[in-house]
């Protein structure tokens, strides 16, 4: 998503453990970490910002591990949509309506779910009036219900 930072996994070893694929036209700005470190020494406010970014990434990764380990399929998809809404809001975009750039299969791969499970869960959310789905166009009708699904101890 625009404005996001990738590649923090390669800071220690210089090798990245994963790859990224742009789902739409994108621009990438490559900045070697040693250059960022040098600039951070000159500008302490930059160092503080870099630490915040790294901390946010640690929290996100931890959340992803919890998601894959402890959440049901419904909770995973609800969490995915809530997270997407929050990221769109942070960029000044609509939280209630958006085009889903990932296919159902890609979402399943990301969430550790089968394509059929993702499709079935989207249909369930649609039937329950939580979201409206027209191919990749998603309209969030009940964001509070989605958030409750993520927090539900026994979402079935």
Regions found by a protein language model. Name each.
Residues 2, 7-13, 38, 67-70, ...:
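Generic structural "secondary-structure junction" signal
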Residues 1-3, 10-13, 48, 80-83, ...:
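Short amphipathic alpha-helical surface micro-motifs
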Residues 23, 31, 42, 68, ...:
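Residue-level signal for short amphipathic helical patches enriched in basic/charged
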Residues 86-156:
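Phosphate-/nucleic-acid-contacting segments
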Residues 41, 45-114:
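Polybasic "coupling" helices that flank or enter modular domains
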Residues 1-59, 63:
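Cyclic-nucleotide recognition modules
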Residues 4, 21, 29, 75, ...:
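Residues that recognize and position ribonucleotide moieties
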């Amino acid at each position: 998503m625009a404005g996001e930072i990738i590649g923090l996994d390669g800071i220690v070893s210089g090798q990245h453990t994963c790859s990224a694929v742009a789902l739409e036209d994108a621009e990438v700005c490559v900045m070697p970490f040693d250059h960022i470190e040098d600039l951070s020494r000159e500008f302490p406010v930059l160092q503080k910002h870099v630490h915040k970014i790294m901390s946010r990434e640690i929290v996100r990764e931890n959340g992803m591990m919890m998601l894959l380990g402890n959440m049901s399929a419904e909770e995973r998809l609800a969490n995915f949509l809530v997270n997407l809404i929050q990221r769109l809001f942070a960029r000044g975009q609509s939280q209630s309506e958006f085009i889903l750039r990932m296919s159902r299969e890609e979402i399943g791969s990301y969430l550790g779910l089968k394509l059929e499970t993702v499709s079935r869960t989207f249909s369930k959310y649609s039937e329950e009036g939580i979201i409206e789905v027209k191919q990749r166009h998603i309209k969030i009708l009940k964001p509070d219900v989605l958030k409750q699904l993520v927090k539900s101890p026994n979402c079935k």
